[in-house]
Amino acid sequence: MSSHPIQVFSEIGKLKKVMLHRPGKELENLLPDYLERLLFDDIPFLEDAQKEHDAFAQALRDEGIEVLYLEQLAAESLTSPEIRDQFIEEYLDEANIRDRQTKVAIRELLHGIKDNQELVEKTMAGIQKVELPEIPDEAKDLTDLVESEYPFAIDPMPNLYFTRDPFATIGNAVSLNHMFADTRNRETLYGKYIFKYHPVYGGKVDLVYNREEDTRIEGGDELVLSKDVLAVGISQRTDAASIEKLLVNIFKKNVGFKKVLAFEFANNRKFMHLDTVFTMVDYDKFTIHPEIEGDLHVYSVTYENEKLKIVEEKGDLAELLAQNLGVEKVHLIRCGGGNIVAAAREQWNDGSNTLTIAPGVVVVYDRNTVTNKILEEYGLRLIKIRGSELVRGRGGPRCMSMPFEREEV
């Protein structure tokens, strides 16, 4: 195996190294009135969410997997005072601060934090207005007066524990994504600094998508089925135009993939990413949410004569997957066993969002009892974790993890 720092040529190869983000104070800055703005449906209890996340990380370590943390990698990337200052300025520029006085006060607050990881975690948590010096009434501008009841000078980033989405590892390359919502697009700044300045990863990884692009793509829609085949979702969060840009870059940079299967499915929050309805769990097995099957369209995309060739596939999905993966037969394991009530409940609680850590070995939430029983009946080994608080953000084990290294299969 090569010594390249990023090696992800499948969804199922034995996981060697993975990046997580331990939920932090950003969750304590979630408020009922602003949940929709911050892409949440409920407010997790931070203390229990951290316990659940720590248990998730330990379960991975118990399987011999090295666990990295986003906040540590980002802090390690601030390798000089100049890079640190640049990071603060980019963070401020992207924070949608409308008045100069507030920006000056926040800059002073951030420069006053000397520890790099503490600085990174503060940028993640957001900044309440009460943390800043009060602006005298006579010095307030119209923005201050109109937005006087809004509590934040800079919004928190509560979705950060879903490390799958801001960037995606593809082969030896990275797709540094432009995300669906402004509140999440700021998250990609940490990936930018990791892959530009980190002592291990900085300058050593090709980017096949860039956060400065103007069309949207998220890592939950990017699946590496094999060393030859990718699957990409056209979803609520990922535009078809982004997929075309990504694929041209992948093919031109010779990242190693020969074909992409583009999955077009229902555009709604329930099915926000492909990996919320479809994941690979073994050489010949996938979980799937039955509700997407009727309206699913799959397109095969290749690169010939310096242009994309796109063909809509009309056949059976299992047969299409078997053909592209070189296996005799593919089994589609339906979330909830196909029962309409169990399927809807367990998909909402991420029953289809499995993290495969080796062929036939998957991490799942323990709460999805119907789907878990079926997976075990298919011969899979399940590592069950609690997620009563983590699931409130609408993401499962795959959403909460970004593989950096897998063994070849």
From Swiss-Prot:
Keyword annotations from UniProtKB, A to Z:
Arginine metabolism, Cytoplasm, Hydrolase
The cysteines covalently paired via disulfide bonds are none
Record's Pfam families? Answer: ADI
Has keyword Repressor? Answer: no
EC number(s) per entry: 3.5.3.6
Q: Could you tell me where this protein is found in the cell? A: Cytoplasm
Enumerate the InterPro entries for this protein: Arg_deiminase
Its main subcellular localisation, reduced to a broad class, is: cytoplasm
Q: Which reaction does it catalyse?
A: L-arginine + H2O = L-citrulline + NH4(+)
Q: Which GO terms describe its biological process?
A: arginine catabolic process to ornithine; arginine deiminase pathway
Q: Name one GO molecular function term.
A: arginine deiminase activity
Superkingdom, natural source: Bacteria
Pathway named in the protein's UniProt entry: Amino-acid degradation; L-arginine degradation via ADI pathway; carbamoyl phosphate from L-arginine: step 1/2
Q: Which GO terms describe its cellular component?
A: cytoplasm
Segments spanning the bilayer are none
- Positions annotated as active site in the UniProt record: C399
Similarity section: Belongs to the arginine deiminase family.
What is the name attached to this protein's record?
Answer: Arginine deiminase
